[in-house]
A protein has these predicted regions:
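Glycine-rich anion-binding loop/nest that anchors nucleotide
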Residues: 139-145, 168
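Structural motif
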Residues: 3-4, 21-24, 44-47, 62-65, ...
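Phosphate/ribose-phosphate-bearing ligand recognition and processing surfaces
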Residues: 143-153
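Short, structured patches in soluble enzyme cores that scaffold and shape functional sites
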Residues: 100-101, 120, 142-144
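Conserved active-site and cofactor/substrate-binding residues in soluble primary-metabolism enzymes
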Residues: 26-33, 50-53, 101, 122, ...
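Long, charged alpha-helical interface segments
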Residues: 72, 78-115, 129, 151-197
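Nuclease catalytic cores that cleave nucleic-acid phosphodiester bonds
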Residues: 117-118, 124-131, 136
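Residues that scaffold, gate, or flank divalent-cation-dependent active/transport sites
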Residues: 4-17, 31-39, 43, 53-96, ...
Length: 197
């Protein structure tokens, strides 16, 4: 298994043979953390959509819909993009539609992969255990912020990579891994000091 890391959506097109790889989409603040929370709170499914207009179509059909653009909750949606808004008593048993600036765009970009996995610090152990047992190359795909690299997504990529041998990782993965090793003991404070927190 080889692990490569894409630190910005603008680099995603450089991935070769994507249909043979597993892509872990990472948008720590906040889409993938929100998706993980929605599912942990009992939703039957999360439907990620890139376009706000498609999310509105789902809303008109009675679905619960959440999302943001530029960090602001979309007017008329049931929720924003904070995991804390998706309470168990509201989302349990429901299909929830989510549309965000960065994360859902990246999920759609990765849709031609062999498989797409959602990664957040909330499900880190599950993600690592899952991909560890696959016989597929893995792409850690950081959503970043507006096509730019961000620290929180890079740190998660590094956290995943720290469970694998360095020889199996490309340079970007090794950089993320090294950044994580520096921040690991003080992760929450490091995340609080990111531009996007």
């Amino acid at each position: 298994m080889k692990i490569e890391t894409i630190l910005s959506p603008s680099l995603f097109s450089q991935i070769e043979d994507i249909d043979k790889k597993v892509v872990v989409v990472i948008d720590i603040l906040r889409a993938t953390s929100t998706i993980t929370t929605i599912l942990a709170n009992g939703a039957s499914a999360v439907i990620p959509v890139k376009e706000e207009s498609i999310a509105r179509e789902y809303k008109s059909k009675g679905y619960l819909v959440g999302g943001e653009r530029g960090g602001e909750t979309i007017t008329g949606f049931d929720f924003g993009n904070s995991p804390f808004q998706y309470k168990k008593e509201i989302v349990s048993g429901q299909e929830v539609v989510l549309s965000t600036t960065n994360g859902t765009k990246c999920i759609e970009m990765a849709s031609s992969a062999h498989q797409v996995v959602i990664g957040s610090f909330l499900n880190l152990e599950s993600v690592v255990n899952y991909i560890m047992h696959l016989d597929k190359d893995v792409v850690l795909f950081a959503a970043g912020w507006q096509d730019r690299v961000n620290l929180e997504d890079s740190l998660f990529a590094g956290a995943v990579a720290s469970s694998f041998a360095r020889r199996d990782c490309d340079d970007a993965t090794q950089m993320a891994r090294d950044a994580y090793s520096v921040a690991e003991g003080n992760l929450f404070e490091t995340l609080q000091n990111t531009n996007h927190f």
